[in-house]
Amino acid sequence: MGVTALIMAGGKGTRMESSEEKPLLRVGGKPVIEHVLTALKNAKRIGSIVVAVSDYTPKTAKLLLKYPVSVVKTPGKEYVSDMGYAIRTLNLQTVLAIGADLPLIDSEVIDDIVEHYERCGKPALSVVVSMETKAKLGLGGKYGFELSGKHVVPAGINVIDGRRINEKELDEEIYVSDRKEVAMNINTVQELRIAEELFQKALRK
Protein backbone atom coordinates (compact mmCIF):
# COMPACT_ATOMS: atom_id res chain seq x y z
CA MET A 1 0.00 0.00 0.00
CA GLY A 2 2.82 2.41 0.70
CA VAL A 3 2.94 5.77 2.39
CA THR A 4 0.49 8.59 1.64
CA ALA A 5 2.24 11.77 0.53
CA LEU A 6 0.53 14.97 1.68
CA ILE A 7 1.66 18.09 -0.18
CA MET A 8 1.03 21.23 1.87
CA ALA A 9 -0.12 23.82 -0.68
CA GLY A 10 -2.55 26.05 1.21
CA GLY A 11 -0.33 28.71 2.77
CA LYS A 12 -0.49 32.45 2.10
CA GLY A 13 3.16 32.79 1.04
CA THR A 14 3.25 36.35 2.38
CA ARG A 15 7.06 36.68 2.28
CA MET A 16 7.15 36.24 -1.50
CA GLU A 17 5.75 39.73 -2.21
CA SER A 18 4.12 38.23 -5.30
CA SER A 19 0.50 38.06 -6.42
CA GLU A 20 1.12 34.51 -7.67
CA GLU A 21 0.26 31.58 -5.41
CA LYS A 22 3.51 30.10 -4.09
CA PRO A 23 2.94 26.55 -5.43
CA LEU A 24 2.59 28.06 -8.93
CA LEU A 25 5.88 30.00 -8.93
CA ARG A 26 7.91 28.69 -11.85
CA VAL A 27 11.29 26.98 -11.67
CA GLY A 28 12.67 25.47 -14.86
CA GLY A 29 9.56 26.61 -16.72
CA LYS A 30 7.17 24.61 -14.50
CA PRO A 31 5.17 25.41 -11.36
CA VAL A 32 7.20 24.39 -8.32
CA ILE A 33 4.45 22.04 -7.12
CA GLU A 34 4.84 20.01 -10.33
CA HIS A 35 8.45 19.22 -9.40
CA VAL A 36 7.23 17.92 -6.02
CA LEU A 37 4.47 15.89 -7.68
CA THR A 38 6.95 14.28 -10.09
CA ALA A 39 9.32 13.30 -7.27
CA LEU A 40 6.48 11.72 -5.29
CA LYS A 41 5.03 9.93 -8.32
CA ASN A 42 8.42 8.32 -9.03
CA ALA A 43 9.17 7.40 -5.41
CA LYS A 44 8.91 3.66 -4.74
CA ARG A 45 7.77 4.16 -1.13
CA ILE A 46 4.81 6.44 -1.94
CA GLY A 47 1.48 4.74 -2.55
CA SER A 48 -0.82 7.73 -3.06
CA ILE A 49 -0.71 11.52 -3.17
CA VAL A 50 -3.00 14.04 -1.47
CA VAL A 51 -2.67 17.81 -1.84
CA ALA A 52 -3.89 20.17 0.88
CA VAL A 53 -5.15 23.47 -0.57
CA SER A 54 -7.11 26.37 0.93
CA ASP A 55 -9.03 29.50 -0.04
CA TYR A 56 -5.61 31.16 -0.45
CA THR A 57 -4.65 28.79 -3.32
CA PRO A 58 -7.63 28.44 -5.72
CA LYS A 59 -5.47 28.44 -8.86
CA THR A 60 -3.36 25.63 -7.43
CA ALA A 61 -6.54 23.62 -6.78
CA LYS A 62 -7.57 24.18 -10.40
CA LEU A 63 -4.16 23.06 -11.73
CA LEU A 64 -4.45 19.82 -9.75
CA LEU A 65 -7.56 18.77 -11.67
CA LYS A 66 -5.28 17.36 -14.38
CA TYR A 67 -3.36 15.16 -11.94
CA PRO A 68 -4.34 11.76 -10.47
CA VAL A 69 -4.22 13.10 -6.91
CA SER A 70 -6.76 13.65 -4.14
CA VAL A 71 -7.34 17.21 -2.96
CA VAL A 72 -8.42 18.26 0.52
CA LYS A 73 -9.41 21.81 1.44
CA THR A 74 -7.91 23.01 4.72
CA PRO A 75 -8.46 26.23 6.73
CA GLY A 76 -5.11 27.66 5.52
CA LYS A 77 -3.95 28.51 9.05
CA GLU A 78 -0.37 27.20 9.04
CA TYR A 79 1.62 24.08 8.14
CA VAL A 80 1.21 21.96 11.31
CA SER A 81 -2.44 22.89 11.89
CA ASP A 82 -3.44 22.19 8.27
CA MET A 83 -1.43 18.94 8.23
CA GLY A 84 -3.36 17.70 11.27
CA TYR A 85 -6.66 18.80 9.73
CA ALA A 86 -5.96 16.87 6.49
CA ILE A 87 -4.81 13.73 8.31
CA ARG A 88 -7.88 13.69 10.56
CA THR A 89 -10.32 14.52 7.76
CA LEU A 90 -9.05 11.75 5.48
CA ASN A 91 -8.23 9.30 8.29
CA LEU A 92 -4.71 8.84 6.90
CA GLN A 93 -2.25 6.33 8.36
CA THR A 94 1.46 6.67 7.56
CA VAL A 95 1.90 10.13 6.03
CA LEU A 96 4.84 11.97 4.48
CA ALA A 97 3.94 15.67 4.65
CA ILE A 98 5.97 17.93 2.38
CA GLY A 99 5.88 21.59 1.38
CA ALA A 100 4.89 22.50 -2.18
CA ASP A 101 7.97 24.74 -2.50
CA LEU A 102 10.85 22.23 -2.85
CA PRO A 103 11.74 22.39 -6.57
CA LEU A 104 14.89 20.23 -6.39
CA ILE A 105 13.37 17.33 -4.45
CA ASP A 106 13.62 13.94 -6.15
CA SER A 107 12.30 10.41 -5.67
CA GLU A 108 15.59 9.09 -4.29
CA VAL A 109 15.53 11.61 -1.44
CA ILE A 110 11.86 10.84 -0.71
CA ASP A 111 12.53 7.09 -0.52
CA ASP A 112 15.56 7.69 1.71
CA ILE A 113 13.46 9.71 4.18
CA VAL A 114 10.70 7.08 4.31
CA GLU A 115 13.25 4.30 4.81
CA HIS A 116 14.87 6.23 7.66
CA TYR A 117 11.44 6.64 9.28
CA GLU A 118 10.72 2.93 9.00
CA ARG A 119 14.09 2.04 10.55
CA CYS A 120 13.87 4.50 13.46
CA GLY A 121 10.84 2.85 15.03
CA LYS A 122 9.35 6.14 16.24
CA PRO A 123 5.84 7.43 15.38
CA ALA A 124 7.12 10.72 13.94
CA LEU A 125 10.12 12.05 12.02
CA SER A 126 11.10 15.62 11.19
CA VAL A 127 13.68 16.46 8.52
CA VAL A 128 15.98 19.38 9.33
CA VAL A 129 18.82 21.14 7.50
CA SER A 130 21.85 22.81 9.06
CA MET A 131 22.09 26.58 8.77
CA GLU A 132 25.62 26.04 7.45
CA THR A 133 24.22 24.20 4.42
CA LYS A 134 21.55 26.86 3.93
CA ALA A 135 24.17 29.62 4.08
CA LYS A 136 26.39 27.87 1.50
CA LEU A 137 23.47 27.98 -0.92
CA GLY A 138 22.74 31.62 -0.11
CA LEU A 139 19.52 30.76 1.70
CA GLY A 140 18.10 32.08 4.93
CA GLY A 141 16.27 30.14 7.61
CA LYS A 142 13.84 30.92 10.41
CA TYR A 143 12.52 28.98 13.38
CA GLY A 144 15.79 27.13 14.00
CA PHE A 145 17.08 25.26 17.04
CA GLU A 146 20.30 23.72 18.35
CA LEU A 147 20.97 20.03 17.74
CA SER A 148 24.26 18.37 18.73
CA GLY A 149 26.09 21.70 18.49
CA LYS A 150 24.58 22.57 15.09
CA HIS A 151 21.99 25.23 14.34
CA VAL A 152 19.31 23.52 12.25
CA VAL A 153 16.02 24.56 10.65
CA PRO A 154 13.00 22.47 9.64
CA ALA A 155 12.98 21.43 5.98
CA GLY A 156 9.20 21.25 5.69
CA ILE A 157 9.19 17.45 5.42
CA ASN A 158 7.69 15.25 8.14
CA VAL A 159 6.62 11.62 8.42
CA ILE A 160 3.99 10.70 10.99
CA ASP A 161 1.75 7.84 12.03
CA GLY A 162 -1.58 9.52 11.33
CA ARG A 163 -3.39 7.23 13.74
CA ARG A 164 -1.61 9.07 16.55
CA ILE A 165 -2.18 12.62 15.28
CA ASN A 166 -4.31 13.60 18.30
CA GLU A 167 -1.61 12.75 20.83
CA LYS A 168 -0.12 15.93 22.32
CA GLU A 169 3.46 14.67 22.38
CA LEU A 170 4.96 12.07 20.08
CA ASP A 171 8.44 10.59 20.28
CA GLU A 172 10.06 12.20 17.23
CA GLU A 173 13.15 11.28 15.25
CA ILE A 174 15.14 14.27 13.98
CA TYR A 175 16.74 13.47 10.62
CA VAL A 176 19.49 15.88 9.56
CA SER A 177 19.89 16.09 5.78
CA ASP A 178 22.37 18.46 4.22
CA ARG A 179 21.35 17.73 0.63
CA LYS A 180 20.48 20.73 -1.50
CA GLU A 181 17.35 18.91 -2.67
CA VAL A 182 16.02 19.21 0.88
CA ALA A 183 17.59 22.57 1.79
CA MET A 184 16.20 24.47 -1.21
CA ASN A 185 12.74 25.75 -0.39
CA ILE A 186 11.29 29.03 -1.60
CA ASN A 187 10.12 31.80 0.73
CA THR A 188 11.51 34.94 -0.94
CA VAL A 189 12.12 36.34 -4.42
CA GLN A 190 15.86 35.86 -3.88
CA GLU A 191 15.35 32.19 -3.01
CA LEU A 192 13.28 31.75 -6.17
CA ARG A 193 16.23 33.11 -8.18
CA ILE A 194 18.66 30.77 -6.38
CA ALA A 195 16.34 27.82 -7.04
CA GLU A 196 16.34 28.62 -10.76
CA GLU A 197 20.15 28.84 -10.80
CA LEU A 198 20.54 25.50 -9.01
CA PHE A 199 17.95 23.87 -11.26
CA GLN A 200 19.72 25.04 -14.43
CA LYS A 201 23.09 23.96 -13.01
CA ALA A 202 21.72 20.46 -12.35
CA LEU A 203 20.43 20.27 -15.94
CA ARG A 204 23.90 21.01 -17.31
CA LYS A 205 25.50 18.11 -15.43
Predicted regions and their residues:
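Conserved core of the sugar-phosphate nucleotidyltransferase
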Residues: 105-187, 197
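Short beta-strand/turn micro-motifs composed of small residues
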Residues: 9, 53, 99, 128-129
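Short catalytic helix/loop segments, enriched in acidic residues and glycine
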Residues: 22-36
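Short beta-strand-to-loop acidic/aromatic patch adjacent to the donor-nucleotide binding site
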Residues: 93-101
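N-terminal nucleotide-binding beta1-loop-alpha1 segment
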Residues: 1-18
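Active-site glycine-centered loops adjacent to acidic/histidine catalytic or metal-binding residues
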Residues: 11, 101, 188
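Conserved N-terminal catalytic core of the sugar/cofactor nucleotidyltransferase
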Residues: 32-94, 107-108, 147, 152
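Hydrophobic helical membrane-anchoring modules
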Residues: 189-205
